[in-house]
A protein has these predicted regions:
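Glycine-rich phosphate-binding loops that contact phosphosugars or nucleotide phosphates
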Residues: 35-116
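Cofactor-/ligand-binding subdomain signature composed of acidic, glycine-rich
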Residues: 1-37
Length: 116
């Protein structure tokens, strides 16, 4: 498929996702509500990071808490310590981003709250 094929199909996929929105985010909402998180940290790169950057201000306003967006490399090297008590969300458009998977492995190894 070419990029134009994805662009032409995007409105259909968006409609499908909106119809299933409660189902698609149920686990994330359950985890978020069951914890005592004071921040949200989104770990992403490339187009996933761009999408997270676009959503950041809205999420921060809606949740009334700090929301940060960091690359997987920065997360593993130094961005994992602050803010404490953050829910970490690892985002990968394809699900195969090796750097994002490495960050998720770091989260799991260090018993950090994480959703992917």
């Amino acid at each position: 498929m070419k990029m134009l094929d994805y662009v032409q199909r995007a409105h259909v996929r968006m409609g499908e996702n909106l119809e299933r929105s409660s189902e698609l985010v149920a686990l994330l909402v359950d985890i978020f509500q069951s914890g005592s998180f004071n921040a949200l940290r989104i770990v992403a790169s490339g187009s996933s990071r761009h999408a997270a950057d676009c959503a950041r201000d809205y999420l921060q306003d809606a949740l009334q808490m700090q929301v940060s967006v960091v690359t997987p490399e920065a997360f593993v090297d130094f961005e994992h310590t602050y803010p404490r008590h953050a829910l970490n969300i690892a985002v990968s458009q394809s699900g195969y981003s090796t750097n994002t998977i490495a960050a998720l492995d770091y989260m799991r190894t260090h018993d950090m709250a994480a959703v992917a």
